[in-house]
Amino acid sequence: QLNYSPDW
């Protein structure tokens, strides 16, 4: 599973 979650 590849999930991109930015911290901005």
Curated annotation (Swiss-Prot):
Signal peptide: none annotated. The modification Tryptophan amide is found at W8. The modification Pyrrolidone carboxylic acid is found at Q1. GO terms for cellular component: extracellular region. GO terms for biological process: flight behavior; neuropeptide signaling pathway. It is found in: Secreted. It comes from the Eukaryota. PROSITE patterns: AKH. Keywords: Amidation, Flight, Hormone, Neuropeptide, Pyrrolidone carboxylic acid, Secreted. The keyword Secreted applies. InterPro entries: Adipokinetic_hormone_CS. GO terms for molecular function: hormone activity. This hormone, released from cells in the corpora cardiaca, causes release of diglycerides from the fat body and stimulation of muscles to use these diglycerides as an energy source during energy-demanding processes. Belongs to the AKH/HRTH/RPCH family. This is Adipokinetic hormone. It comes from Melolontha melolontha (Cockchafer).
